[in-house]
Amino acid sequence: MIKNEIKILSDIEHIKKRSGMYIGSSANETHERFMFGKWESVQYVPGLVKLIDEIIDNSVDEGIRTKFKFANKINVTIKNNQVTVEDNGRGIPQAMVKTPTGEEIPGPVAAWTIPKAGGNFGDDKERVTGGMNGVGSSLTNIFSVMFVGETGDGQNNIVVRCSNGMENKSWEDIPGKWKGTRVTFIPDFMSFETNELSQVYLDITLDRLQTLAVVYPDIQFTFNGKKVQGNFKKYARQYDEHAIVQEQENCSIAVGRSPDGFRQLTYVNNIHTKNGGHHIDCAMDDICEDLIPQIKRKFKIDVTKARVKECLTIVMFVRDMKNMRLIRQTKERLTSPFGEIRSHIQLDAKKISRDILNNEAILMPIIEAALARKLAAEKAAETKAAKKASKAKVHKHIKANLCGKDADTTLFLTEGDSAIGYLIDVRDKELHGGYPLRGKVLNSWGMSYADMLKNKELFDICAITGLVLGEKAFEEKEDGEWFTFELNGDTIIVNENDEVQINGKWITVGELRKNL
């Protein structure tokens, strides 16, 4: 029997039951990532990486809020399945806050143990932090078997201890002059398709810290005791040594090649927008608006934005973006209005467009892709036209009785309906057929097959003879100025002075030599 009932879950129950909404997949999956200078297929649990990122993001947010006067040193350590993130920030505000049940607890306790508690809910125009939903660090706590948060404001320290996904929690005040925040946790591997923080998680974390060091050069990052270096130009050139780099006050962008379709690596403030968003759309729209017309003028070929995009890799770091809009807690895509993005990043798209035109390594794959698409489209049109011709019935075709049978028949092409009347009187009905042309046949030299078949006479000739443009129907022989064609058993010898010319002014010889 199907139950018809309503359930009300607590925040923590909902997070555990629908974890994908908050931290992403808990399955061990294969994803393509760019790590240490090359694209790799990496197997890991995205949700587990999210737990580490949430704590790192909190420290980076403190640096952003204080314009890097504080939290300008962030240390990350991963050892024996235990993660520690420490910063030299101001510490989490320790003022007492009231919970929905009326209980008063210190601010750090609320931030680490209650979902939807935090200091980033103000959607004012000046907010530039990555945190926005108030669930980040509590998510890490919920999916940990051990979680210890320590924070100090220079006068007092608060230590919060939790275990088994916050089933057990306690806190204490300890007077002290230390200022900063330190979080240590061990993930609950029962919630994920893995049983350890293997080397791949260390590599992914180090790779992210290298990226953050590029985005925020004012922060000194260390990983397992070693300083992490950051330089945008060097970082971008890992993706493509020929990459075009442009650095503005609020945005750094690199445009390089991609042999396997469009690729991107983008950060907005400290958030990895792995599915891109409106900032990527803005950049591509503005670059293509200038680039596509120039390609058309220079190479006489039409190219679309989709064709340009599929040949490129974009590395884009946006800094100090105010009140950004992101999809869900996973924050994988930026959805801020286009106008806000354009006014903030101030990209010189025309210069990037000119640089692409002058960079053969990046430009030529775009041209080659456009040509390949054009040829494929033409071939498809030709095939369609040829198929149509093969099934067509030509009403003015006077058919030889043995046409299509095991006999050598001849098709006579006459100039006009009146001329074919003489043929009808003298022809051998068994072997001779005819078709009246309307004047001289179209000069089709240089035309595509699809365009040639738009001409009624050429279409009808192909329909009558079964010739398919582009396929060799006979063997061509050249002897001085004379050309010999063998067609259906008949040998026809012509030269350039014959009535049917070979230089392309008429079709019969010229086009047969070129196309058939």
Curated annotation (Swiss-Prot):
GO terms for biological process: DNA topological change; sister chromatid segregation. It comes from Enterobacteria phage T4. Large subunit of the DNA topoisomerase that untwists superhelical DNA. Controls of topological states of double-stranded DNA by transient breakage and subsequent rejoining of DNA strands. SMART domains: HATPase_c, TOP2c. The lineage of its organism: Viruses, Duplodnaviria, Heunggongvirae, Uroviricota, Caudoviricetes. Its cofactor is Mg(2+). This is DNA topoisomerase large subunit. It catalyses: ATP-dependent breakage, passage and rejoining of double-stranded DNA. One of its GO terms (molecular function) is DNA topoisomerase type II (double strand cut, ATP-hydrolyzing) activity. GO terms for cellular component: protein-containing complex.
